[in-house]
Amino acid sequence: MTVAEDRLNAFLGRAVGDMAASVSAVLVLIGDELGLYSALAGQRLSPGELAEKTDTSERYVREWLANQAAGGYVDYDAQNDQYYLNEEQTLCLADPNGPVDLPGAYQIIRDLFHVRERAVENFRTGKGMEWGEHHPCLFEGTERFFRAGYNANLVSSWLPALDGVVEKLTAGARAADVGCGHGASTILMAQAFPTSEFVGIDYHGASIATATERAAKAGVTNAYFEAADATSYEGGDYDLIAFLDALSHCSFR
């Protein structure tokens, strides 16, 4: 066997990059859970100051910051030994109401490791997994990652792109959000169109329970949620039926 050294080195370089990305993915999740990104938004902090602000260990925080700076997830002021998030990093990592939520995407990826053993079994049997069989981090990550896009586009551009829909919703209509998950899209529409009624539908009971809690916390009274699948939900008098969270699962035959 003849091995080309240049191709070998190129392949190993890609593999090492993948391994580094895997480690960094875990550190993104840690930074999100501990509030490290939020603490860095809008201010420059030393490792000690960040640790004190987040009630964490300075030794671990210093290593976390080194990784994040090397990966371009935080910026470093070498002159003052301080770290901070620039505007773009803040938008993606520390703005819960912004148009991008990168930590949410990493939560989705995290689920793949939780279901690895089941995936191995499925490779052997050809079977699949129900949505509800996944780890809860998938449901939370999906809500966060998709909600960011809804914040930026759903009311301002997606609904207006549908002829007459905004006018109907403004006047008072009835709408269904099928496969609503934790209800982010349903709640946003209900807040934007208070004279309309919105029904969030999902077969996953735990997600429906979370959606109901989210709506109550947001003070939304014109949205409610029911557990049903896409073929058995009640009601046929809807002015709008939306598939948002569940669009990628739909069959278009």
Where are these regions (language model features)?
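Short acidic, hydrophobic short linear motifs in intrinsically disordered regions
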Residues: 44-52
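Residue-level recognition of oxygen-bearing side chains
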Residues: 35, 45, 252
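Conserved adenosyl
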Residues: 112-248, 253
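Conserved Class I S-adenosyl-L-methionine-dependent methyltransferase catalytic core
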Residues: 2, 6, 14-33, 38-39, ...
